[in-house]
């Protein structure tokens, strides 16, 4: 096959047909030999059928998570909730507990909601029907439709954006130009083999066209890559100017009663961490001592009076939009019956029983410090 020269067509929205054909074929040939094969939801069962439910769960997990991280979560999920009916019938707390550690917990709640809508219905096979389900955007819908049904729908996840930004040496941050990148992905899609092509495109971004140190010599698109021709593939995609993340200091109270139980509350079903359990606390006000923050927040949120007795742990946790510093204190419960004034419910739990509740990732170190402080092993706290 003749290698086509790099030209200005690769910088425009429209690819020449000969360029499109070359890119499609070269990528598929590369994928047959080097693509990722050990992805369980990509393989048919003994009856020769793909598990559409498993594909759906996987694609939602992969929205904000890399494959190697999501894979063990997917395997545990499929063992516990192997069908859409099982998911629809599950308790939300079980769903959140299975998701614990993956972050962006609204994905789990929306999967649960969508399963209740899908129960007893045939699987949707058009874009609009998938987009109508909770938690499904255009790229996820396209990936499900191409993977499960071999339907010709384009995708645009982070890997694909990076590949296309380098292929065209696009000089602006991709987030501001989604329509441009959707146009590129639509043009390149092999409509005869959409399942294979979309998977190959994701594999290319995940294995060769990586954020750092891309393996350009092995790339099937090297001869047509404008970023490679410019000698600067790592400069693409162009990044937004970094902004310093604001820091919030959170005072947290681990409140103990005379029975040695700790007080936890369940967050409202809103925001990234909705429905999860946590140790109560809140933001430090300007000029306020952190111990006073804990006392005030527990009075406002739970209607209880506590005495701060000793520090337990201090830890930092970063989200995409802010940094949090948790100053955690052991507290003695003095008076007041705990009330869920700013949460769904409150509960007294023995420290060894905390593993039965889904907590945000930042709370794992708090729990570990608590168990160590009172001589409980982490193994004894795990749910069988």
Where are these regions (language model features)?
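The catalytic Nudix box helix
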Residues: 279-313
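NUDIX/MutT-family hydrolases
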Residues: 330-374
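Serine residues within intrinsically disordered or low-complexity segments
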Residues: 8, 12, 21, 377-381
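Phosphate/ribose-recognition catalytic cores of enzymes acting on nucleotide-derived substrates
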Residues: 315-337
